[in-house]
Amino acid sequence: MISISFLNCFFLVFLFLFFSDVHGSYNGLGLKPQMGWNSWNKYACDIDESIILNNAKAIKEEGLLDLGYEYIVMDDCWSKHERNATTGRLEANPDKFPNGIGSMAKKLHDMGFKFGMYSSAGKYTCAGFPGSLNHEQIDADTFADWGVDYLKYDNCFNEGKSGVPLISYERYKRMSDALNKTGRPIFYSLCQWGEDFVWNWGNTIANSWRISGDIFDTFSRKDVRCPCETIECFALQGDHCSVMNIISKASFLSSKAGMNSGWNDLDSLEVGNGGMSFEEYKTHFTMWAILKSPLILGNDVSSMSPMDKLIVSNKELISINQDIGTNPAALIWKKKYGDEYIELFSGRLSNNDWVVAVLNAASEPLKMGIHLSDIFVDALGNAEHDWLATDLWNNNVKLVSDRIRANVASHGVQVWRFQQYKVKNTNDKFFSFNKH
């Protein structure tokens, strides 16, 4: 009998050989991570046309559309519980969407947005509404007729068609092919929860792919409903996953994303939903930005506080997230401190700039000194230069010749944009940190 591990390995080798010469997005979309808003984190099933349009209106009035938040994505619970008995098509719940989905899509388009829909690659959606498994083409045609620009495609009630990468790939490819046959450009966002090594094959059929179970509005609290701590646990991702849990999984996947493939999706943002502190939300947004996750708001934008708006409006971090042609920042090291970790990330940007971030997951503030030889471990020639480092939260600029010093709050992050200044003489370099 052929083992599951053998099938997994065979399929991964097949993908590498078959797609090694593929360049660019599979459908020409998603050359940078998508930005927008999704209804699920805040509203779950409690959605209707007014909620969707009011959030879109607030996004535009707050200037967030101008910053790139262009997709308005309606999540689960929008449809009737049964398909149309005559046509077989999905239909909107008339109590929630009395004017129909196409009418709402037109209103969003007229406001300058792109419109996103939700379905599942299963018999039912996660909330028990009709799914698209075995109905891919008729549903894709319906979405295209409604003017849909984006599809979030979930993984619930998949009838056991998972557990082996090839099986999951084929199930999700059916909708990919169906969307492409419509002739309408539709961004394809897999919500496959990181199962079956989706980061190894998602880029061949989609524009982004989830790498974890559902996010929960907490920084680092462990939850038995999110049993996986690392990406190796690929078959039981669960939900109620903390920000740090998801960062831990994403940290090892920087090579799997980019303009020539697609994007690791760390799930929608929780900023503004009230479960974390200001410092923790800053860390949440910073790490999503530099890891080049999609930046999808998940709050009630119409009641967003000035501090929450400050976080999601950080133009410098958004520009790094949207920097075309660059890959996610990479985890350089992860050092134990107490029960938690201190982590260093760096990544190349356009014009030979770099993004550098130090994350302090510990329960106390720390003073740190990070040396250039650590930051540029993959490009040591850069350690021979002086650098101008701009703090991307307070805009302070400092000259860095040997190491950069930082006071990092508990559950906080310090993030800089490094710009080359001049060549210098080298000194001995080391890493150190001390209690604040």
Swiss-Prot record:
Disulfide pairings: 45-77, 126-156
Compartment list: Endoplasmic reticulum lumen; Secreted
Keyword ATP-binding: no
Residues annotated as catalytic: 154 (nucleophile), 214 (proton donor)
GO terms classed as biological process: melibiose catabolic process
Glycosylation site list: 84, 180
Matching Gene3D superfamilies: Aldolase class I, Golgi alpha-mannosidase II
Enzyme Commission numbers on file: 3.2.1.22
Residues spanning the signal sequence: 1-24
Name by which UniProt lists this protein: Alpha-galactosidase mel1
Job of this protein: Secreted alpha-galactosidase required for catabolic conversion of melibiose to glucose and galactose.
Recorded family membership: Belongs to the glycosyl hydrolase 27 family.
Organism in which the protein naturally occurs: Schizosaccharomyces pombe (strain 972 / ATCC 24843)
Catalytic reaction equation(s): Hydrolysis of terminal, non-reducing alpha-D-galactose residues in alpha-D-galactosides, including galactose oligosaccharides, galactomannans and galactolipids
Keywords: Disulfide bond, Endoplasmic reticulum, Glycoprotein, Glycosidase, Hydrolase, Secreted, Signal
Organism domain of life: Eukaryota
Gene: mel1
